[in-house]
């Protein structure tokens, strides 16, 4: 079934279904619970004579104008903007502040979390009740309804993947679980238990602990997350609106980026992007290679501290740099943009880091975790110190007292730069000593601190268990 037929299906839904409303999220947004309401009066306001998809410009951009109620706090607004930013970064959808457009959405705190399906013509309300609905995944759920998407658990092949416990669903809410008619066009994509459009296991249950939706064949599969759009959610948006983009969402706690893979799947792409969105803590990104194409003049890798290009820039690396500095985000989001006019490639890996950070100032201080108190066992911290291009980093230690062991196999501080891998014994330091000044060969230094699970050094040492260093930068 082609996209045109899918438009007819969605428009049919607009004429026959009540507005869908997302339930609130609990348990750290892992499950969606029952707070939706059916608002039958809204269906009478639908303009049935208009197409329900938002139009696409000749440049390939789909614009959805919106207004945002002044009733939201600055914190609420920041959450909504962050949710919107992911569409901008990874699709051809652009939610933009309304100027004089006739068709637009009004984001307001009305009476729950709900939205019309698709574009209905004129102004249309998207309700995000505050408090309760202003969470990133809930905002994106409702924005997906605006784009024309129904709930994942109502798609026409759902009986293969989930079982509805009808006895646990009150009659007034059973319409929210009925399979979509006519049959949905799933665009050749698999059923998505992790979709932001999927209800939670206990949504609308008539009794605590009684499930209304059970995955099969494995009933333990998580459903109903409200962290944000899934990778398949984004694929559906890009296929439905025929977005000509090269983008990927990475959401595992660790993983890899490979521009060669992206380019092989998207020939002749001049731009590919990755959004790394880990569940918690910070993203640490380390490049294994950067191979500019012969004669390149503008190929680059840009890394942003957030969900897109409106976020602070962490690095902007072009052809002339062979060794890219390791970078760390301030939160759980990092955006990577690769621009190439030829055959340039890069490979990188990322991981979740709970302790550490990135320093880009001309000077500063780095200390052991918990300083001036003793650091805890089973602790890992990473610090990336990056100086401006053409500069180098000097480390001057004020104090250094870690557990001593042969080859520093217990507690240690490893120090590496662009000339060293950071894995050899000579890069690890431990014990109590006067550390000499260390100078990098390039413009960055990577510090990795590790303490093992045993507290033997901390219990017997009278010298203290910490390190403190002052770093400066200077022209090479």
Annotate each predicted stretch with a short phrase.
Residues 42-48, 52, 56-60, 67-202:
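Metzincin-family zinc-dependent endopeptidase catalytic domain
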Residues 57-65, 120-121, 212-220, 282-284, ...:
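Surface-exposed beta-strand-to-loop junctions
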Residues 2-76, 82-85, 89-92, 205-212, ...:
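Disordered inhibitory propeptide/activation segment of secreted metzincin zinc metalloprotease zymogens
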Residues 3-6, 25, 231, 240-476:
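Domain-level representation of secreted and single-pass membrane ectodomains enriched
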Residues 55-56, 171-253:
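Extracellular (secreted or membrane-anchored) zinc-dependent metallopeptidases
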Residues 66-70, 128-130, 287, 399, ...:
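Short glycine-centered, acidic/aromatic-flanked micro-motifs in structured strand/loop junctions
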Residues 6, 76-83, 135-139, 230-233, ...:
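Alpha-helical interaction elements in eukaryotic regulators
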Residues 52, 76-82, 174-180, 207-221, ...:
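Short, polar loop/linker segments at the starts of domains and inter-domain junctions
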